């Protein structure tokens, strides 16, 4: 596999010296492997620190002039980043990687070690921040000091199947909060929790079924239900639950109580440490239970605060996203609970479509990408207006879309929002869209990188899912990869001149 990777055309191109032309000032995008190290290829220019935004750029998002960023990226890291991003955009390569990771090759210690070593030296090092919370915190520190980009610490486990695993994962999340607390507040923005890691998926499905049935049948009551905000609207997909579910057994109720305790322990630790907590979203089979747990926790830990501790995630590619957001915000305002929201487009389009089709129902996802963009921008505008009126709302705009960034910049100007007050920030995945991250940063916004960590074997499901989720987006990032290749060519020319 490694040999075939090295023989691909995109790696050969930087060495075709006959095709090289002067590229002038390097207008390149960013590698993610950013370290506080200055390279010297040819003449070195004196420039201000990367994390001091240029005031002249606060009225626009510059996605072309990345010379400052690349000045701190070693050529070896830039080369690896280009290779990894190119490979992640090749569908058959993603399929091959998935097959290898689930094949018998992983049963033999020799081949397993070789595969894990290859993964660690390529995809893992590019998309992950380290093998434990302390290593990830060090990576956050080095990235911030080199670039001014903050970090979101994410323990990269996908799910747990039993109580013991849920407890282990909870302790990992608590250690993550401790690691974040050890950093200067300027270096990090939040930690992220996946409810699927602290509550068995089977129980989340059961709770979601019961919540859907309660919404369908107002006379159907759930004795175990805590106070929460609305998790459905009239346009929400309810086809997952066509018959009345059996009530939770006594054992399931005890498991649910234990899951509530885990998330509340995590929230309490965040509250004590003044570390915001972002709750990740899942597919619509599980999302009602996740929304319920996020909102019930927010009511407990956000009330009477100037800023939220608990943030829930809204997926704008869902048709009902806007309605559910408005309902939740209205209820939060009524209860005087400052609420935080992370706004994403969504990542489960294929699986949502397959499930809906198998049930003879319409997909809960918007028909077109344009409708998803419109929904995202409408939700973004709504949340920015809420955050600007002193209500205490917090907003994390997780997007790789430059047009949404430009709209946010215009809206912030219209509303007179202080872009650096921490109530509104942008986020992109670690290892992706660094050009956008730097453009937004230089425009004056707080910008963070979503930085998962964990042992290589633990992170593999995350890496595979990330590859599948972002295959289309990676393919559309050809311009970024082209600019990275241009920077490699420029350095080679400068090195031989």
Task: Kindly give the residue locations of the regions a language model identified.
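Positively charged, amphipathic and often flexible ligand-engagement surfaces
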Residues: 2-497
């Amino acid at each position: 596999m490694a040999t075939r990777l090295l023989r691909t055309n995109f790696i050969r191109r930087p060495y075709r010296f006959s095709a090289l032309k002067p590229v002038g000032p390097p207008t390149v995008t960013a590698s993610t492997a950013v370290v506080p190290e200055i390279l010297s290829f040819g003449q070195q220019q004196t420039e201000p620190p990367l994390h001091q935004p240029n005031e002249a750029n606060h009225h626009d998002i510059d996605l072309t002039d990345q010379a400052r960023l690349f000045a701190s990226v070693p050529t070896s890291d830039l080369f690896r980043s280009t290779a990894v991003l190119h490979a992640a955009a090749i569908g058959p390569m993603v399929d091959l990687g998935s097959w290898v990771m689930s094949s018998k090759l992983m049963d033999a210690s020799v081949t397993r070690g070789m595969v894990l070593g290859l993964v660690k030296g390529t995809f893992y090092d590019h998309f992950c921040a380290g093998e434990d919370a302390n290593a990830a915190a060090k990576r956050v520190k080095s990235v911030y000091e080199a670039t001014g980009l903050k970090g979101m610490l994410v323990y990269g486990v996908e799910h747990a199947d039993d109580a013991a695993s849920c407890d282990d994962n909870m302790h990992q999340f608590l250690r993550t909060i401790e690691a974040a607390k050890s950093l200067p507040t300027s270096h990090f923005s939040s930690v992220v929790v996946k409810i699927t890691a602290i509550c068995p998926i089977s129980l989340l499905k059961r709770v979601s079924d019961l919540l859907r049935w309660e919404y369908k049948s107002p006379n159907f009551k759930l004795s175990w239900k805590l106070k929460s905000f609305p998790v459905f609207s009239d346009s929400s997909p309810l086809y997952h639950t066509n018959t009345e579910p059996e009530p939770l057994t006594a054992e399931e109720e005890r498991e649910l109580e234990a899951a509530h305790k885990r998330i509340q322990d995590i929230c309490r630790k965040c509250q004590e440490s003044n570390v915001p907590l972002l709750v990740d979203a899942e597919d619509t089979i599980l999302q009602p239970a996740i929304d319920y747990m996020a909102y019930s926790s927010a009511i407990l830990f956000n009330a009477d605060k100037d800023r939220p501790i608990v943030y829930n995630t809204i997926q704008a590619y869902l048709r009902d996203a806007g309605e559910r957001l408005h309902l939740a915000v209205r209820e939060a305002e009524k209860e005087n609970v400052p609420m935080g929201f992370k706004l994403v487009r969504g990542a489960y389009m294929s699986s949502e479509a397959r499930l809906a089709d198998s049930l003879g129902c319409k997909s809960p996802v918007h028909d077109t990408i344009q409708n998803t963009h419109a929904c995202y921008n409408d939700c973004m505008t709504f949340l920015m207006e809420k955050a600007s009126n002193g209500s205490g709302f917090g907003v994390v705009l997780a997007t790789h879309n430059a047009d949404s960034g430009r709209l946010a910049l215009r809206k912030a100007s219209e509303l007179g929002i202080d872009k650096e007050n921490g109530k509104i920030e942008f986020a992109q995945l670690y290892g992706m869209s660094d050009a956008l991250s730097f453009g937004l940063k230089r425009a004056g916004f707080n910008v963070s990188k979503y930085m998962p960590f964990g042992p290589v074997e633990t992170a593999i499901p995350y890496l595979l899912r990330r590859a599948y989720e972002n295959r289309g987006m990676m393919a559309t990032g050809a311009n970024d990869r082209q600019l990275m290749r241009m920077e490699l060519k420029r350095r080679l020319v400068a090195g031989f001149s």
